[in-house]
Design a protein with these regions (language model features):
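Membrane-interface extramembranous regions
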Residues: 1-131
């Protein structure tokens, strides 16, 4: 296993953990309402899809998309903390340890994915893709 493959695997692991935590919280958020429940379904499906894509066909585009998903999840959480998110989660959310841990994992995934994109010669992500 190369260092480039290891870095992609770290991103995949971060995707899987994020997806799993969000999926586990779907029922509790449906109890709050349809919007929060649907929001958590989306927050589960997006990183899960990224994990599958990076596992099957790692590429710069897949890494960029994954970085965007992680950034969106982190920014979305910050918005929910500050003011709520219209339609999906209109109520402000209190800071919780599990949420903070999840955001730390997503931030790690974002940083590693961005690092792979910044140093393409060092990561050799394009060579991981076979045609």
């Amino acid at each position: 296993m190369t260092f480039a493959e290891l870095r992609v695997d770290v991103v995949i692991l971060c995707c899987a953990v994020s997806a799993g935590i969000h999926a586990a919280l779907v029922p509790a958020h449906f109890e709050e309402g349809t919007g929060p429940g649907v929001g958590f379904i989306l927050a589960s499906v997006a990183p899960a899809a990224c994990a599958v894509l990076l596992t099957r066909r790692p590429s710069r585009l897949a890494l960029a998309g994954t970085a965007a998903v992680f950034a969106g999840l982190i920014i979305g959480y910050l918005i929910v903390l500050a003011s709520g998110l219209p339609v999906l989660h209109p109520e402000r959310e209190p800071v919780e340890a599990l949420a903070v841990c999840t955001k730390v994992i997503e931030a790690i995934g974002l940083a590693v994915a961005a690092g792979c994109l910044r140093r393409p010669a060092a990561t050799h992500v394009d060579r991981l893709v076979t045609t």
